[in-house]
Regions:
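Pre-Walker A adenine-sensing motif
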Residues: 11, 15, 19, 25-45
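Walker A/P-loop
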Residues: 46-62
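Positively charged, amphipathic N-terminal segments that serve as targeting/anchoring signals
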Residues: 51-54, 96-103, 113-129, 197-384
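Conserved Walker A/P-loop ATP-binding site and its immediately adjacent core
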Residues: 71-109
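Conserved RecA-like ASCE P-loop NTPase motor core of nucleic-acid helicases/translocases
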Residues: 74-81, 270-271, 361-368, 449-453
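Inter-Walker segment of RecA-like/P-loop motor cores
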Residues: 95-159
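SF2 helicase catalytic motif II
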Residues: 167-197, 202
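Conserved RecA-like P-loop NTPase helicase motor core
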Residues: 382-460
Length: 479
């Protein structure tokens, strides 16, 4: 078949013979290019705004006001946890085990809403597996198709199929805290990746990291038609390659990347976070050429510095003296019963007793693998993941132990950076630490006792409190 080349509204296409491995016909060529132009228009029209403010500075209030001022718009509001999202949009819920379960109103045959919450008037819905024939993704897609306001989680949104976002161009997407847009994946073993690259079934795009699937080669090797991966163990791999969602880092590690077109589908995107420029999500947007506006407000570090009662004890801090002490690699190099873990266990107990911290007035973090050894029975219920965020359940806690030294995954940083993007590891580390500390009473402008044995983490925290980051100086100069 002779290659086809179309020129429409200045969008020049390359000669093609197939679309998604299907032979060209007049009908599917027209539909394909109409869809392509529609997507390019959406690329231009999507507005991306970041509300950048310290935790407890009123970002959620800003979002609520925006929604109330634009009641005729359609909204999708996503958070890390459903409990927080239900509270924001006015859905009553009960806690069953560890899960937030919405209350159903038998009189209205609908969700039970908190009428004292102004957003309850907009009658937000949530994805329901039962109504989606066993799939929350199907349910969310159905709700979008009808045009409801919707609340959901990061996890569901980031792993949706782009084809499920029906009518997204009519919606404003509101994201509470940055999305996790990269994950290391074991979809295919490293050995299998090497083999598939060698025989040409997989190959790398021009950027040197995006993985592509060659169906022609696949057919030659497994004796299937050239456009058939359906029903094979490679079907999902091929689909993810089609969506540009697999990256190969350092020639060995496969990384899943959320499709940037997921965001481009929407009319507008609003994200609420703090120090956005220090997050992988910021690098991700730059890498994909998505422009954004940052609106900053709220307090400066100097205004809250007096609330941070950071323990200054040479003996108790000695376990974190070196630059990499208490990091993930530091603990991985030690045996399970190690000097570092045992010291953390002893010092955690010493510090909490020193502060007179009762069970309901203390939290701590360490890496999950070390939790059992460090927490013991006494502190087991006080542990939270070091990357915990977007929960207000611990707003009265006054005593916090931060027993980690956080470095971003080098693999994910390489995935996010691309060739032109800078990434500040210290700012990333700072944002992770602040998110955890602000789960406690700091978010309510109350003083907190803080134990951070890592000398590196303390240095970064004080650098922020003194506004010594160049990034912070730029922001402060702009006030």
């Amino acid at each position: 078949m002779k290659p086809v080349q179309l020129v429409m509204n200045s969008f020049i296409t390359k000669p093609i013979q197939t679309i998604h491995n299907k032979p060209l016909t007049t009908v599917n060529v027209v539909l394909y290019y109409v869809k392509s132009i529609e997507e390019k228009v959406n690329l231009i029209m999507t507005e991306f705004v970041v509300y950048d403010a310290m935790m407890g500075s009123g970002k959620t209030t800003q979002v609520k006001e925006y929604i109330l001022q634009n009641p005729n718009e359609r909204f999708i509001y996503i958070t890390p946890f459903l409990k927080e999202s239900y509270g924001v949009v006015g859905i009553n819920f009960n806690i069953v085990g560890d899960e937030a379960v919405p209350v159903f109103n038998d009189l209205t045959n609908d969700i039970d809403y908190d009428e004292s919450n102004p957003l309850s008037r907009l009658r937000f819905k949530y994805p329901d597996r039962k109504k989606g024939k066993g799939s929350k993704e199907n349910s969310l897609s159905h709700l979008m198709n009808i045009g409801y306001n919707i609340t959901s989680t990061h996890q569901l949104f980031t792993h949706m199929s782009i084809n499920s976002l029906i009518g997204a161009d009519q919606y404003t997407l509101i994201i509470d805290e940055a999305l996790s847009v990269y994950e290391e994946t074991n979809l295919v073993s490293q050995k299998e990746v090497t083999r598939l690259l060698k025989i040409g079934i997989l190959y790398l795009d021009e950027d040197g990291i995006t993985v592509r699937f060659n169906r022609d080669k696949f057919g030659d090797n497994v004796k299937l038609d050239t456009d058939k991966t359906e029903g094979t163990s490679y079907e999902h791999l091929a689909m993810m390659c089609d969506l540009s969602q697999l990256l190969l880092i350092d020639g060995k590690t496969l990384v899943w990347e959320m499709s940037a077109d997921m965001l481009r589908k929407f009319k507008k995107v609003i994200m609420c976070t703090y120090m956005f420029e220090g997050q992988l999500f910021s690098s991700y947007l730059k890498k994909h050429g998505i422009e954004y506006e940052i609106i900053k407000f709220g307090k400066k570090p100097s205004e809250v510095k007096h609330l941070f009662n950071v323990l200054d004890d040479k003996k108790l801090n000695s376990i974190g003296a070196s630059e990499t002490a208490l990091s993930k690699s530091f603990f991985e190099k030690e045996p399970t019963k190690s000097t570092g873990r045992d010291a953390c266990k002893r010092h955690l107990n010493t510090v909490m007793r020193k502060w007179g911290a009762k069970t309901d007035n203390r939290i701590f973090t360490c890496f999950k693998k070390d939790k059992t050894v460090i927490s013991d029975v006494r502190y087991n219920k006080n542990w939270l993941p070091f990357n915990c965020r977007a929960t207000n359940d611990y707003g009265k806690v006054e005593n916090v132990a931060y027993l980690v030294n956080v470095f971003p995954s080098p693999t994910l940083v390489k995935a996010a950076k691309g060739k032109e993007t800078d990434f500040d590891i210290e700012i990333h580390t700072l944002t992770e630490m602040l998110q955890f500390l602000y789960r406690g009473c700091l978010r309510n402008d109350l003083p907190m006792n803080i134990y951070i044995p890592s000398s590196r983490m303390r240095r970064i925290l004080f650098k922020w409190l003194n506004s010594d980051f160049e990034y912070m100086k730029v922001l402060n100069d702009g006030d």
